[in-house]
């Protein structure tokens, strides 16, 4: 890195300068530099220590010209739990690129935790940089889609387009038949308005069968799905004798001017067995049909959950998402894609989706 440049860990005294930088480099995405969103994202995370944030900045004088930001999490690897970071954002001012800044910031981040995680695409150029720093591509995370109302999914607009859209939806009705009549094989689907001790008991009980998975305790889940500014998630739980056996988190895009919801995403799912997974996916599809959503998508790496998607009419599509890892512990587990349980909620895919609430 050039001698005129400095790279170091961020402190809260740098906040205004960093937000100004984010406003410049993400001029078309003002949410990135929104103070409320930034503070929720990096300061209100239950794992966060505000005096030791996993954010690193590059400076030219007092001007921020690059930054790497991560969020803290915990990951269960085998029988042990480790602190980790998910790298969410790495960007350099276009006038300061090719000066070694990105590599220096990655190096600082790697010293922070023994396990470092990221989800990237080749379009971002980050995979090549991270591989040069010793990171490994563990897997391409599969993407699954189910089309419910093709007109709503692919045809927007009013007038003649609305007629074509409605016709396409009607022609596809046979593909939706039967979903609403199915019920959980053992238990009851309920709305969850807040995660509580039931979710913690589910995690304690069911995490034992997963070898490589981000910890899903109620405090972190509430931060992510019920406290995020300007977003509403729908959470469905399967209960049996008042015991939570699994949950699924859905995110519906805001409706357009014609009241059409083009897409919904399954942001997260966690369950105790394959039957529960199947019941939760079916409940998610049923809710999407009620809202006349064009299509439901998800990115997910776990055989049992993927099998449940396939049995509920989802099909695999091309995915650009790459799970990348650099670990100083348990490489035999964390570098094996068959050991992982990963959903959209584990990466920035959910965090950076367009808000569906407007104030």
Please report, for each region that a protein language model flagged, where it lies by residue.
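Active-site/acyl-donor-binding loops of N-acyltransferases
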Residues: 2, 116-176, 224, 234, ...
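A conserved beta-strand-loop-helix scaffold within acyl/acetyltransferase catalytic domains
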Residues: 5-90, 190-269
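Core nucleotidyl-transferase/polymerase catalytic module
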Residues: 36, 47-71, 76, 85-89, ...
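Conserved acetyl-CoA-binding loop-helix of GNAT-fold acetyltransferases
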Residues: 89-111, 274-286
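Alpha-helix termination/capping residues and helix-transition junctions
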Residues: 111-112, 230, 242, 290
């Amino acid at each position: 890195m050039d001698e005129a440049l400095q790279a170091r860990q961020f402190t809260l005294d740098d906040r205004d300068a960093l937000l100004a930088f984010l406003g410049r480099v993400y001029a078309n995405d003002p949410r990135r530099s929104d103070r409320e969103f930034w503070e929720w994202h990096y300061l209100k995370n239950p794992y966060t220590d505000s005096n030791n944030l996993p954010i690193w900045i590059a400076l030219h004088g007092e001007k921020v010209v690059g930054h790497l930001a991560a969020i803290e999490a915990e990951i269960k690897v085998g029988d042990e739990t480790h602190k980790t970071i998910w790298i969410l954002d790495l960007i350099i001012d276009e006038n300061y690129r090719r000066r070694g800044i990105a590599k220096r910031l990655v190096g600082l981040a790697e010293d922070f935790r023994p396990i470092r995680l990221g989800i990237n695409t080749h379009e971002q150029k980050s995979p090549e940089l991270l591989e040069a720093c010793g990171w490994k591509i563990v897997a391409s995370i599969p993407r699954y889609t189910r089309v419910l109302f093709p007109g709503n999914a692919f045809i927007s607009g009013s007038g003649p387009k609305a007629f074509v859209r409605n016709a396409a939806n009607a022609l596809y009705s046979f593909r939706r038949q039967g979903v609403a009549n199915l019920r959980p094989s053992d238990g009851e689907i309920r709305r969850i308005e807040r995660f509580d001790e039931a979710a913690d008991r589910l995690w304690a009980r069911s995490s034992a069968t997963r070898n490589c998975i981000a910890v899903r305790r109620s405090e972190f889940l509430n931060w992510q799905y019920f406290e995020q500014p300007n977003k509403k998630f729908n959470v469905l739980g399967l209960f049996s004798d008042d015991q939570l056996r699994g949950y699924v988190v859905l995110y519906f895009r805001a409706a357009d001017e014609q009241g059409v919801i083009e897409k919904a995403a399954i942001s997260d799912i966690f369950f105790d067995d394959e039957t529960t997974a199947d019941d939760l996916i079916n409940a998610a599809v049923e809710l999407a049909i009620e809202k006349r959503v064009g299509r439901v998508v998800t990115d997910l790496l776990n055989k049992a959950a993927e099998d449940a998607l396939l049995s509920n009419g989802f099909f695999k599509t091309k995915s650009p998402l790459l799970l990348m890892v650099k670990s100083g512990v348990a490489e035999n587990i964390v570098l094996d894609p068959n050991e992982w349980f990963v959903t959209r909620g584990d990466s920035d895919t959910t965090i950076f989706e367009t808000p569906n609430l407007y104030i």
